[in-house]
């Protein structure tokens, strides 16, 4: 099993993110897009983050692979998220979450041989992956699952 905390990824501002800073917290990874029917989930993600920020980090990863619904630059994405939803949780650089250029983070999240839990494929924007404070994949949730769903929040209590 590969350690998720060793995976390298940059923020939307092109600064290195050290995932090990979030050891001992749950991390909810979400592939996000600004022009999707599920984009309104940004609001619930922000509310969830504010409610549980002592034991939860949310990390959004912009992705343009589903319906070209995240065409903007890093600056566009950051402005959209702040102005429309007041997003304060962590956002990564735009990445691929599937296919031949799949980012190492999403390789780990979707491959049982790496995460030692489950294999999956990212089906659409706003699919969610919950990682435990010990760095284990807890579960994944399709786009239709709201951030406030008890399927997710039961782990945070």
Regions found by a protein language model. Name each.
Residues 107, 112-157:
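Thiol-/selenol-based redox modules, centered on thioredoxin-like
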Residues 75-123:
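Short, internal strand/loop/helix patches
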Residues 31, 55-73, 88-99:
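Thiol-based oxidoreductase modules, predominantly thioredoxin-like and allied folds used
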Residues 1-20, 40, 104:
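N-terminal "domain-start" segment that seeds a small globular fold
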Residues 24-26, 35, 39-64, 81-85:
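Conserved helix-turn-beta segment immediately C-terminal to the redox Cys motif
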Residues 11, 31-35:
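Amphipathic alpha-helical repeat scaffolds
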């Amino acid at each position: 099993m590969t350690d998720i905390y060793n995976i390298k990824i940059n923020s939307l501002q092109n600064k290195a993110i050290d995932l090990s800073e979030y050891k001992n917290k749950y991390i909810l990874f979400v592939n996000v897009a600004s022009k999707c029917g599920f984009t309104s989930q940004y609001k619930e993600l922000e509310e969830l983050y504010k409610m549980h920020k002592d034991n939860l980090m949310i990390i959004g990863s912009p992705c343009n692979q589903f319906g070209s619904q995240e065409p903007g630059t890093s600056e566009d994405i950051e402005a959209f998220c702040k102005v429309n939803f007041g997003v304060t949780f962590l956002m990564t650089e735009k990445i691929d979450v599937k296919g031949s250029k799949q980012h190492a983070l999403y390789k780990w999240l979707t491959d049982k041989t790496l995460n030692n839990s489950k294999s999956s494929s990212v089906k659409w924007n706003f699919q969610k992956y919950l990682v435990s404070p010990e760095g284990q994949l807890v579960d994944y949730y399709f786009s239709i699952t709201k951030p406030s769903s008890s399927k997710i929040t039961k782990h945070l209590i």
